[in-house]
Swiss-Prot record:
Family to which this protein belongs: Belongs to the peptidase C1 family.
Glycosylation site positions: 95, 156
Organism: Zingiber officinale
InterPro entries: Papain-like_cys_pep_sf (IPR038765), Pept_asp_AS (IPR025661), Peptidase_C1A (IPR013128), Peptidase_C1A_C (IPR000668), Peptidase_C1A_papain-like (IPR039417)
Disulfide bond annotation, renumbered to this chain: 24-65, 58-98, 155-206
Keywords assigned by UniProt, alphabetized: Disulfide bond, Glycoprotein, Hydrolase, Protease, Thiol protease
Stated role: Cysteine proteinase with a high level of diversity in substrate specificity, an amino acid bearing a proline residue at the P2 position is preferred.
EC number: 3.4.22.67
Catalytic residues, chain numbering: 27, 161, 181
Signal peptide extent: none
Name of the protein this chain belongs to: Zingipain-1
Gene Ontology biological-process annotations: proteolysis
Membrane-crossing segments per the record: none
GO function term, MF aspect, one: cysteine-type peptidase activity
């Protein structure tokens, strides 16, 4: 397969502005929602900010502010028939009761797929088509204090933070992933981090290639 030399889904209008999860451990919801916002824009042309809070409150196979998994968020959206907009089910940053009155199916997806583990080439193929959910180790000081540039600092390969890969490019012969975080716009490069790509470890930098997944949305005939 011929892959584009670089891709940045922000430039293609498939990424809403960076959000902030606050003190709630809901990165899994922000990660899943960013991927759904992306594929919805790619398929329909509409960029709609969707509700992380609905996932926190209603995705019972996840644990709200105590953590969760993007693939289970995708399962919830599929089983629920869709997800509401952020406007109508806004983020509070706390565990709430599922508000069934605010269950408008603003955006739906058809299924989801896991990218083969520990294979940056497969992740590259997936990101060529849409933003992809990944897990990374964000517990380290280097990561938390990241300001700018291509991140080459120390980190483990444990899965403790989810975020969304929105592109891949090369600068001065260094390959990197463009990763959207959910710690607000003041962190990193306006809320993003560039992470070195094609490294020796198959798990990728900070474990980025361990368990990527993405939602699937068919174009309505």
């Amino acid at each position: 397969d011929v892959l584009p030399d670089s891709i940045d889904w922000r430039e293609k209008g498939a990424v809403v502005p960076v959000k902030n999860q606050g003190g709630c451990g809901s990165c899994w919801a922000f990660d899943a929602i960013a991927a759904v916002e992306g594929i919805n824009q790619i398929v329909t042309g509409d960029l709609i900010s969707l509700s992380e809070q609905q996932l926190v409150d209603c995705s019972t196979r996840n644990h709200g502010c105590e953590g969760g998994w993007p693939y289970r968020a995708f399962q919830y959206i599929i089983n629920n028939g869709g997800i509401n907009s952020e406007e109508h089910y806004p983020y509070t940053g706390t565990n709430g009761t599922c508000d069934t009155k605010e269950n408008a199916h603003v955006v739906s997806i058809d299924s989801y797929r896991n990218v083969p583990s520990n294979d940056e080439k497969s992740l590259q193929k997936a990101v060529a088509n849409q933003p992809v959910s990944v897990t990374m180790d964000a517990a380290g000081r280097d990561f938390q204090l990241y300001r700018n540039g291509i991140f080459t600092g120390s980190c483990n390969i444990s899965a403790n933070h989810y975020r969304t890969v929105g592109g891949r490019e090369t600068e001065n012969d260094k390959d990197y992933w463009t990763v959207k975080n959910s710690w607000g716009k003041n962190w990193g490069e306006s809320g993003y981090i560039r992470v070195e790509r094609n490294i020796a470890e198959s798990s990728g930098k900070c474990g980025i290639a361990i368990s990527p997944s993405y939602p699937i949305k068919e174009x309505x005939x």
